[in-house]
Amino acid sequence: MQAEGRGTGGSTGDADGPGGPGIPDGPGGNAGGPGEAGATGGRGPRGAGAARASGPRGGAPRGPHGGAASAQDGRCPCGARRPDSRLLELHITMPFSSPMEAELVRRILSRDAAPLPRPGAVLKDFTVSGNLLFMSVRDQDREGAGRMRVVGWGLGSASPEGQKARDLRTPKHKVSEQRPGTPGPPPPEGAQGDGCRGVAFNVMFSAPHI
């Protein structure tokens, strides 16, 4: 009888813990699936109920406006994300011989950038300052930590001479630039593109355990 009383007390305390009525936005808060009902109704351990709420049967936690919630602010600008997915971001600075060449590359790369965030799309942003091109790439690691996804870009460079492939390495990312010497897309109006050559960037995202 004494052990039974302790079990009942644990269930009652559970309702006031994380995910109970005391925290409206917790895993067992507002409106939810069967997992949330199990957590607040005392039919099973709180941990198992919370796992069901975010699992395949309970669905992803919902934000205040009905969208998939993220750990930071309850919103995900890129659409629904799996609980085990992470958003990977990569910044690249590429110097060119002149501001016109950097602007030429920015215009060509911007054609491939999605105007609005879409689920599963790679988000790319390009900015020019002088002869420097700043590239920002964001992708969602849907396969879990440690997996890689390759993103390819095709662009034209105003440089008349081809260059050997080179690697830019950081502790987490590897970026390869290749100039195969094939003709690239036509340059924008006003640019000197007589020696335009094809350039391809391969960005490999890796998410090692930290």
Curated annotation (Swiss-Prot):
<feature type="region of interest" description="Disordered">
    <location>
        <begin position="154"/>
        <end position="197"/>
    </location>
</feature>
<feature type="compositionally biased region" description="Gly residues">
    <location>
        <begin position="56"/>
        <end position="66"/>
    </location>
</feature>
<dbReference type="GO" id="GO:0005813">
    <property type="term" value="C:centrosome"/>
</dbReference>
<comment type="similarity">
    <text>Belongs to the CTAG/PCC1 family.</text>
</comment>
<dbReference type="InterPro" id="IPR015419">
    <property type="entry name" value="CTAG/Pcc1"/>
</dbReference>
<feature type="compositionally biased region" description="Basic and acidic residues">
    <location>
        <begin position="163"/>
        <end position="177"/>
    </location>
</feature>
<dbReference type="Pfam" id="PF09341">
    <property type="entry name" value="Pcc1"/>
</dbReference>
<dbReference type="GO" id="GO:0070525">
    <property type="term" value="P:tRNA threonylcarbamoyladenosine metabolic process"/>
</dbReference>
<protein>
    <recommendedName>
        <fullName>Cancer/testis antigen 2</fullName>
    </recommendedName>
</protein>
<feature type="region of interest" description="Disordered">
    <location>
        <begin position="1"/>
        <end position="80"/>
    </location>
</feature>
<feature type="compositionally biased region" description="Gly residues">
    <location>
        <begin position="1"/>
        <end position="47"/>
    </location>
</feature>
